[in-house]
Regions:
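Surface-exposed, charged secondary-structure patches
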Residues: 103-145, 195-208
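Short beta-strand edge/turn micro-motifs at domain boundaries
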Residues: 144-173
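N-terminal secretory signal peptides and thylakoid transit peptides that target proteins
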Residues: 1-16
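Sec/Tat signal peptide C-region and signal peptidase I cleavage site
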Residues: 22-26
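Soluble periplasmic/extracytoplasmic beta-strand elements of cell-envelope proteins
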Residues: 36, 41-45, 95, 119, ...
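Early exported N-terminus immediately downstream of N-terminal targeting peptides
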Residues: 30-106
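Low-complexity, intrinsically disordered terminal/linker segments enriched in charged
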Residues: 164-208
């Protein structure tokens, strides 16, 4: 999910299990655990910086991204109703392009450590059947940035299905207008090409 660098920098390093609502704990463990695991790899990449090749950092990050985010659900919500009509092969190609783009975005945005500190709120809140994990990045100077993960408990466990910047701005909603315009003709090929191109630019050093 593509976000500006300062809005992406977050971590879930110190969330005690006892602070979680009983309902969330009863439904399959800690909703923040996938985010904590993601951030372990993110912080390692940030410390390593550009001395480590982009491809190596992306390869290290991809499993954590796939565990932290329900990428098929995010993609389907971003594309909208046309997604269901795509052939299975097209869906698979689109998901691979979206996954590569998502991993490239996080890899590019987390390529250095500049004195930021990362926090996560000790309490979560319910959003229907979902749970919202609230995090902040506190820069060396300036105002903290709030970034909420909307976590859903499905067969694979807790995964994020959206990110809310400042607690309100849905990344899926922002992404939706972009994606849907590219599949307006019912063909996923333009979106696949766009995601592939953008991932390539990120790998080459272009920042989003």
């Amino acid at each position: 999910m593509e976000l500006p660098r300062r809005a992406l920098l977050l971590s879930a390093l110190d969330l005690p299990l006892a602070a979680l609502p009983l309902a969330a704990r009863a439904q399959g463990g800690d909703p923040a655990a996938p985010i904590a695991a993601l951030n372990t790899v993110l912080l390692a990449n940030m410390r390593a910086g550009r001395a480590v090749p982009f491809a190596s950092r992306a390869a290290a990050l991809r499993p954590a991204v796939e565990r932290a985010f329900d990428l098929p659900a995010i993609l389907a919500a971003s594309v909208g109703p046309r997604y269901a009509a795509f052939a299975e092969g097209a869906k698979a190609a689109l998901l691979e392009a979206f996954t590569a783009f998502t991993v490239a975005t996080w890899t590019a945005n987390f390529d250095s450590l500049n004195g930021e500190t990362f926090q996560i709120a000790p309490d979560t809140r319910a959003a229907g059947a979902d749970v919202v994990v609230t995090s902040r990045i506190v820069p060396r100077s300036g105002e903290p940035i709030r970034l909420d993960f909307v976590m859903r408990n499905a067969a694979g466990g807790w995964r994020a299905v959206d990110i809310l910047l400042n607690g309100t701005i849905s990344r899926v909603a922002v992404q939706r207008s972009d994606f849907r315009s590219l599949v307006a003709a019912g063909d996923p090929a333009p979106l696949i090409a766009s995601l592939t191109e953008r991932a390539g630019k990120l790998a080459a050093g272009a920042k989003s």
